[in-house]
Structure formats: C-alpha cells, structure tokens
Amino acid sequence: MKELASNKEWKKWGESDPLFGVASWNNKNKDGSNPWTNEDFYQLGESDWRDFRTHWERYGLSSNDSCLEIGCGAGRITKQLALYFKEVHAVDVSEKMIEYAKTHVTSSSVSFHVSTGVNIPLNDQSVNSVFSTHVFQHLDTLDIARNYFKEISRVLKRNGTMMIHLPIYKWPSSSRGFKQLYAIRKQLSDVRASMRRSLMEFGLGKPIMRGLWYPVDFFYEEFPKLGFDDIEISMFVTKSNNDPHPFVLARKG
C-alpha cells in the first residue's frame, strides 16, 4: 500500500524539529528566537492534560486501567497519561518521534508502537480508553479517518470511551453567526495552507501539515455503524494558549 502523504509530512517533522512539529507556536522552532526547551514542552502537556481530563471525566471516563494514545509525537501528553492510567499504549507513524518520546517518557507503564497510520497495532478489545489530540486534523481523507475509527472500535473494550480532538464544522447547536465565523475561518485556513504548500514545492516557506475538517454529520452517521453511542461534541478553551479545542467523545456499545 502506498504510504500516506500525511505520514511522510509528519516523519519530516520527527527528523527536523520534533517539539515544534507537535506544538507549532510562534518563534518556538529550534532556530527561532525562543525555541522550546524540554521543560517547557512537557509542562505544556501537563497543563493541557488537566483541561482534557476534566472534560473527559465529566463525560464519563469509564476506567483508568488502560489507554491508547493515537499520535503520541514526542510524548507531550503521553507523560501525563502514564500518571493517570495503569497501562498506556502510545502509537505514532514516526520512528524519530517515538525515539524522542522514549528518552523523556520513561514510565514502565508505557509501551510505544510504530504504526502505519492506517492500522492500530493492538489486539481486539485490548484497551479501555482511547485519546488523541492534534492528529486527526492531519489525516489525508475522511475515508482514512473512517477506517481509523473502525480500528478504534476494534481495539476498544465494551463500554470504553474515546476522546478525539479534530476540527469540526456545521455545529449542531451553535448560533448562525458562530457557524458563519467558523466557516470563514475554515476557508481562510484552507487557502493559507494551499498557498504555503505550493511555495514549499519551490523550496520556499516553512513545512506545513495538511488539514482535514470534519462535518458534524460524519459522526452521527458513521459512529453508530461502528458500534459507538453516547456521541458528544464539545469545544472548550485550554488555559495554555486560550485557543478553542473541539473534541468528539463517544462510548463503545
């Protein structure tokens, strides 16, 4: 099978600048005026996980026995998952990212796995929880995403829950004005990404990951087919950078 374009892009970040690839804040690249230090990078993970965990527990995080993290990167959140869950399986398509994560996430409760970005290298019904942030927004297509959710359903135990961060449009219960602003933001983001990607073909500009947006109908149409129920879409602001983060949460029936 031909390697996914998103895999190739992510592997470049793993080779060139793992921390900035995960958290692309202004001037935080390794050659920037204020590059990430390991201390600051992993403290960011601690702050964000507190916000994520609060909303996951409010939804109904079913167990702290085991968790699959999809797209662990350099281990920003993995480090915190290891303090909460008894067993953590962290997967990523980049061997370089995993090598970096292993250096800084040394808990014996964590197992790292290199994945294809298509299949999850775990047995059926082997984890109680699944978490992912800033990963599904970079997948190639909705068909790839659909297959990945099918894989999540396969490895997730019954009554297990997932919390997945991804960009969503056509919000079900937001005002017309909010929907219009969100649609404009989406269009501008798509145009900017396309322009930057075109410049890269001529050796200009900085690398940029592709962006995939999810129509809200996708979850309500596809998830029940995969055995998920209690579907909830939530957006909240994280304290680390005051940015809104949309998540979809669901339970394996």
Role assignments for model-derived ranges:
Residues M1-G60, C67, A74-L81, F85, ...:
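Class I (Rossmann-like) S-adenosyl-L-methionine-dependent methyltransferase catalytic domain
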Residues D65, K86, N128:
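Conserved acidic residues
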Residues V118-V130:
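A short acidic, Gly/Pro-enriched loop at the edge of an enzyme's catalytic core
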Residues S129-D143:
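A short SAM/SAH-binding and catalytic strip from SAM-dependent methyltransferases
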Residues F136, D140, Y148, I168, ...:
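Flexible, active-site-proximal loop/turn residues at the rims of small-molecule/cofactor binding pockets
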Residues R146-R158:
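A short glycine-rich, Lys/Arg-flanked "PGG" loop and its adjoining helix->strand segment in the class I
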